[in-house]
Amino acid sequence: MATLRRLQEAPRHLLVCEKSNFGHDKSRHKHLVETHYHNYRVSFLIPECGLLSKKLKDLVMEMGPYYSVKKLPLHELITHEFINTFVKKGSLSALTYNTSIDEDNTVALLPNGKLILSLDKDTYEETGLQGHPSRYSGRKSMRFIISIDLMDLSLNLDSKKYRRISWSFKEKKPLKFDFLLAWHHTGTEESTMMSYFSKYQIREHQPKVALSTVRDLQCPVLQSSSLAGEPEEACNALEFFDWLGAVFCNADLNNEPHNFISTYCCPQPNTVAAQACLCTITGFVLPEKILVLLEQLCHYFDEPKLAPWVTLTVQGFADSPVAWREKEHGFHKGGEHLYNFVVFNNQDYWLQMAVGANDDCPP
């Protein structure tokens, strides 16, 4: 019975909620955005808005570019030329795609120059490099994590450590992956990435943008000062988070008797927005671009608006080896790691961070 009971239990999920103000010296909003590296979807919702301003629309269209490179040898990411051209000049993120974190070998390059490898046991042993067991591989360690600091490595390319890693990637266990890459930089031509990897199959991409107007949207009433809500006066943060997910899924919020797909209804109390603008950006989006978008949404209330709040939601790649900073990320049954800002018209904000079963508590 105990085993059956465990099988019936839903996997553990965590939702952390906090509130602050963008003007506070100790506000964490910038640090949190900057350390959530691998983002594949960015969505924002603006109640009582039928048309985006030109400035906001232009910003949405400038969320790229990013690149895909097929069958890129891993040793290309540790060369002196690559580190000097990209890692040291700006902020570079890279992530393997078409790989599953719980089944395949996966690799991520973080903007701080850390190269993270999540490898199955056989591959790990064949590389001959030192790492540590994955936190989520069970009692028998079947997956291992290797972390390589490229900035430190580049200080001495004649070191024994560099020669060993280079030998491992080039000769002992050559590994090739399909990569997504995105690079935030200043003062360098955009074509640098294309020309550098010209001998491989490289393509430039722009994120896909979907704009829609939601009519007669039931919206929860919120009080910026109260995450817990107030009976009959305001909804709490968890109720709002559930509601927002339903809106993104285009679920019916009325709980009508004939609806067999969704029995969800908007929490009470609520108001009806005549129209709301929903924008979704999908691709490989850098934290720097997200931070600019967040700042622009804060300025949305510089002039009086009917909307009491707007939201910005960011979802990470389910198969990234890390979630926030260098914290290991696993898939289990969902692989979700995401955060949401509720931006109020007085510059207060709620920050909601959610992760699945194979993750540490969000920062």
Curated annotation (Swiss-Prot):
GO terms for cellular component: multimeric ribonuclease P complex; nucleolus; ribonuclease MRP complex. Its main location: nucleus. The keyword Zinc does not apply. Transmembrane segments: none annotated. Pfam families: Ribonuc_P_40. Component of ribonuclease P, a ribonucleoprotein complex that generates mature tRNA molecules by cleaving their 5'-ends. Also a component of the MRP ribonuclease complex, which cleaves pre-rRNA sequences. Component of nuclear RNase P and RNase MRP ribonucleoproteins. RNase P consists of a catalytic RNA moiety and about 10 protein subunits; POP1, POP4, POP5, POP7, RPP14, RPP21, RPP25, RPP30, RPP38 and RPP40. Within the RNase P complex, POP1, POP7 and RPP25 form the 'finger' subcomplex, POP5, RPP14, RPP40 and homodimeric RPP30 form the 'palm' subcomplex, and RPP21, POP4 and RPP38 form the 'wrist' subcomplex. All subunits of the RNase P complex interact with the catalytic RNA. Several subunits of RNase P are also part of the RNase MRP complex. This is Ribonuclease P protein subunit p40. It comes from Rattus norvegicus (Rat). The gene is Rpp40.
